[in-house]
Swiss-Prot record:
One of its GO terms (cellular component) is membrane. Keywords: Membrane, Signal, Transmembrane, Transmembrane helix. It holds the Pfam family PQ-loop. This is Solute carrier family 66 member 3. InterPro entries: MannP-dilichol_defect-1, PQ-loop_rpt. PANTHER family: MANNOSE-P-DOLICHOL UTILIZATION DEFECT 1 LEC35 -RELATED, SOLUTE CARRIER FAMILY 66 MEMBER 3. Residues 1-19 form the signal peptide. The lineage of its organism: Eukaryota, Metazoa, Chordata, Craniata, Vertebrata. It comes from the Eukaryota. It is a multi-pass membrane protein.
């Protein structure tokens, strides 16, 4: 029973993450605008994903517990390029991508570096959610922000809480997923709220 639940959580998470950012990317491409999206939020999310993936690889955790992160990073990079493209300058993305790539190698130079980065990872990821919330509160417009993407993110956090408890039982990772679940739900509700407000205004 436990093995079946673990398998379901792992594979459903991978399946969801394979398409997680596609609704958001599609919305941006269809609107030909990144209106409502927060660039700081996306950059912080990318940093959080990178640190988390490096930490899992460094400590040799089971690949099925983190295989979605390369997929998520690739989708976030595509979204980042879309934002810069529709804001008028794709070349501005180059320094950000260079920093992310070099960080992958720097993080594993010393054990204390990766441990410190992982301890900060929860704050980085939480900051990314708050940056998106702040953008929504400021504009009072969800724009092209995809509620589906954020609700799917909530699902993956919930499944990763289960898989963490059943495999590594790493408290740092568990705490991160609990906080991310709460914040993802908050962003989803906020997006839906401002979408309803916009529909009523029309």
């Amino acid at each position: 029973m436990e093995a079946a639940l673990l398998g379901l959580c792992n594979w459903s998470t991978l399946g969801v993450c394979a398409a997680l950012k596609l609704p958001q990317i599609s919305a941006v491409l269809a609107a030909r605008s990144a209106r409502g999206l927060s660039l700081p939020s996306l950059l912080l999310e990318l940093a959080g994903f990178l640190v988390f993936l490096r930490y899992q690889c460094y400590y040799g955790y089971p690949p099925l517990t983190y295989l979605e992160y390369p997929i998520l990073i690739a989708q976030d990079v595509i979204l980042l390029l879309c934002i810069f493209h529709f804001n008028g300058n794709v070349k501005q993305a180059t320094p950000y991508i260079a920093v992310l790539v070099s960080s992958w190698f720097i993080l594993a130079l010393q054990k204390w570096i990766i441990d410190l980065a992982m301890n900060l990872c929860t704050f980085i990821s939480a900051a990314s959610k708050f940056a998106q919330l702040q953008c929504l509160w400021k504009t009072r417009d969800s724009g092209t922000v995809s509620a589906l993407t954020w609700s799917l993110s909530s699902y993956t956090c919930a499944t990763r809480i289960i898989t963490t408890l059943m495999t590594t039982n790493d408290f740092t990772i568990l705490l991160r997923f609990v906080i991310m679940l709460a914040l993802n739900i908050w962003v989803t509700v906020t997006v839906l709220r401002y979408r309803k407000t916009a529909i009523k205004a029309e």
